[in-house]
Amino acid sequence: MALLKISVVVPEGEVYTGEVRSVVLPGVEGEFGVLYGHSNMITLLQAGVIEIETESQKEHIAISWGYAEVTGEHVDILADGAVFIKKESDDRDDAISRAKRLLEDASSDRLAVSSVLAKIESL
């Protein structure tokens, strides 16, 4: 299976870059998945969690909102704010706390935020 290149960038710099099997993005019309060979598109992202599947594990990045440019070979994400939640990390609890604050500040829609927060707590 061919790998998709992905980068997540915020105003402060790069949060994540790598080659992945798939990525699930929190689009404003709902979550959508991207695999290698996807049709080209540019879309708006809402506050939520980006789910990244590498060859060996799943990784998660919480974002406040942003834009995604998708081509057949890569996904470039420009986000207003992002927190990379590493699965096996000493500062994982701190990252989850920062992700919760980021999402709570990003949206006034309490129902949407609570469902995303529940998703983060289950990681």
Swiss-Prot record:
What compartments host this protein?
Answer: Cell inner membrane
**What GO molecular function terms would the record report?**
ATP binding; proton-transporting ATP synthase activity, rotational mechanism
Q: Which Pfam families match?
A: ATP-synt_DE_N
The similarity comment for this entry is:
Belongs to the ATPase epsilon chain family.
PANTHER family in alphabetical order: ATP SYNTHASE DELTA/EPSILON CHAIN, ATP SYNTHASE EPSILON CHAIN, CHLOROPLASTIC
Q: Subunit arrangement?
A: F-type ATPases have 2 components, CF(1) - the catalytic core - and CF(0) - the membrane proton channel. CF(1) has five subunits: alpha(3), beta(3), gamma(1), delta(1), epsilon(1). CF(0) has three main subunits: a, b and c.
Q: What is the protein's given name?
A: ATP synthase epsilon chain
Per the UniProt record, the source organism is Helicobacter acinonychis (strain Sheeba)
